[in-house]
């Protein structure tokens, strides 16, 4: 798996892999908490990817932070 991700990053497909992971996290959130928290998780993950991409961190960590942000923001529900 690590080789596939590093190959994707070398060929410039990192953002595509990021979008696929964001969609997977949105699906997980949808199953756990519903439609609105899933949308907020996707938006939070996208913003986290945009802003944390400039930090010297692996972009996968940024996606996890976005998932945490979406879960925390929508923790109390509708």
From Swiss-Prot:
Species of the source: Sulfolobus spindle-shape virus 1
Origin superkingdom: Viruses
Record function comment: This protein may be involved in virus assembly. Essential for virus function.
Pfam families: DUF5489
Record-given protein name: Uncharacterized protein B-78
């Amino acid at each position: 798996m690590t080789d596939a991700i590093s190959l994707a990053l070398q060929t410039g497909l990192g953002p595509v892999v990021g979008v696929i992971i964001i969609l997977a996290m949105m699906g997980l959130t949808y199953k756990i908490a519903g439609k609105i928290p899933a949308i907020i998780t996707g938006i939070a993950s996208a913003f986290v990817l945009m802003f944390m991409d400039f930090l010297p961190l692996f972009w996968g960590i940024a996606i996890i932070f976005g998932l945490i942000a979406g879960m925390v923001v929508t923790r109390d529900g509708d």
